[in-house]
């Protein structure tokens, strides 16, 4: 078993079991593997919770964990001390100057913004950008990200969950309003017929079988498929975005 995978799971078990992502092949394991390459940068994790993702990043980086939950921020501070700065704030009003960050992480947050708009009856029908809270999040991220910066984004794919998650079209429309360049990937794709087996979580049965023959890193890397302009069935989206 990979050291990083085991270390992350142990952190959840030790510090916050209820915050675990619930899936050993979650797209956030792949996200962390990409973030580990970053050195000597200013990094903001929006909605970073107890700080698991930030804690896995290189110590040469200046890391800020932003969240609305005071309990999660307290937990992060107790576990990681001064290696991570913690700020209590909303995702729609980021308390930073323009062009402040080299890297910004927005992991499994947009679906929360969409849910807020649906429950608050804020959805703008017949508008290409119909979710105002999502638009505010992207507008703020664009403002505080440096011109040569990069946004790392993950969010569940609604084709799998069939709830208030984002669709491919909703996500790409929202990105294009504020950003010119992005690379989108479908994470953990699955065949159409597996929809019939959704309640059995069929999409994740294949990675579990592969684990008997390959290590965790090899499997999560194999689950990433490039966007070719056609929506695909997948569990999640992974996106790298630039101005």
Label for each model-derived stretch:
Residues 169-173, 183-243:
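A C-terminal cap/extension of S-adenosyl-L-methionine-dependent methyltransferases
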Residues 148-155:
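Conserved beta-strand signature within the Rossmann-like core of class I S-adenosyl-L-methionine
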Residues 50-93:
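Class I SAM-dependent methyltransferase SAM/SAH-binding core
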Residues 105:
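A conserved beta-strand element that flanks and buttresses the S-adenosyl-L-methionine
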């Amino acid at each position: 078993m990979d050291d990083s995978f085991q270390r992350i799971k142990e952190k959840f078990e030790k510090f916050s079991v209820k915050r675990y992502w619930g899936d050993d092949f979650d797209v956030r394991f792949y996200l962390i593997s990409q973030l580990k390459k970053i050195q000597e940068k200013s990094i903001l994790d929006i909605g970073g919770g107890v700080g698991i993702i930030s804690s896995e990043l290189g110590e040469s980086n200046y890391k800020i964990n932003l969240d609305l939950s005071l309990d999660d921020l307290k937990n992060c501070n107790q576990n990681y001390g001064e290696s991570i700065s913690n700020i209590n704030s909303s995702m729609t009003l980021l308390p930073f100057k323009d062009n402040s960050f080299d890297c910004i992480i927005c992991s499994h947050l947009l679906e929360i913004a969409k849910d807020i708009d649906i429950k608050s009856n804020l959805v703008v029908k017949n508008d290409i950008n119909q979710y105002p809270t999502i638009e505010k999040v992207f507008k703020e991220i664009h403002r505080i990200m440096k011109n040569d910066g990069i946004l790392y984004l993950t969010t569940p794919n609604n084709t799998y969950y069939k709830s208030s998650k984002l669709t491919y079209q909703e996500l790409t429309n929202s990105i294009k309003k504020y950003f010119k360049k992005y690379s989108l990937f479908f994470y953990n794709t699955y065949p159409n017929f597996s929809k019939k087996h959704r309640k059995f979580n069929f999409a994740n049965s294949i990675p579990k079988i592969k684990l008997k023959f390959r290590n965790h890193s090899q499997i999560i890397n194999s689950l990433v498929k490039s966007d070719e302009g056609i929506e695909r069935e997948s569990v999640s989206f992974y996106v790298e975005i630039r101005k």
